[in-house]
A protein has these predicted regions:
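Short acidic/histidine-centered micro-motifs embedded in hydrophobic/aromatic stretches
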Residues: 14, 18, 32, 50, ...
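Alpha-helix initiation/capping motif
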Residues: 4, 18, 40, 47, ...
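Conserved C-terminal helix/linker of AAA+ ATPases
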Residues: 12, 27-30, 35-58
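C-terminal leucine-rich, beta-strand-based interaction scaffolds used for sensing/assembly
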Residues: 10, 52-141
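Helix-loop-helix "sensor" segment of P-loop NTPases
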Residues: 1-19, 38-41
């Protein structure tokens, strides 16, 4: 149905890996991937292109959201995005410029209550597109 070169299982796994199986974000990414395939045909970068497009679509939303965070929250979000380790660890704190574990924990608690950070095996951003947006902004792309 999707084409000889298309490996639906690989595409599905790529989508689920990026979204961490979150239903809402999985649906968004699957829909955008499908639309891109329908418009442009299959390519090896089908999922990555959809991720880039969805991140770009929400750029202004993420800019506005980012401006609402205090400096500590921004540092924690950057540290989580860049996978700098456990937020209470010395390497994490030094890398992001936070002086104490209690400050980082207060930020994590606040970000968790607001729904931006979740705890699974460790702390992570709930929205994978927001995570990608932070990565892109940090790299200056």
């Amino acid at each position: 149905l999707l084409g000889e070169d298309m490996d639906a299982e690989t595409i599905g796994r790529s989508i689920l890996s990026f979204t961490n199986c979150h239903p809402y974000y999985t649906q968004q990414l699957a829909y955008q991937t499908w639309n891109n395939w329908k418009q442009n045909g299959y390519s090896d970068t089908l999922v990555e292109t959809a991720i880039t497009e969805l991140t770009h679509v929400h750029d202004m939303d993420y800019e506005r959201l980012w401006s609402t965070f205090n400096k500590t929250d921004k540092k924690v979000l950057i540290g989580l995005t860049m996978q700098m380790g456990t937020p209470s660890s010395l390497p994490f704190l030094q890398a992001v410029g936070i002086d104490s574990p209690s400050t980082a924990f207060s930020s994590l608690k606040r970000l968790g209550q607001q729904g931006y950070v979740i705890r699974n095996e460790g702390y992570e951003l709930d929205d994978p597109f927001f995570r990608r947006w932070i990565e892109v902004k940090r790299e200056g792309r």
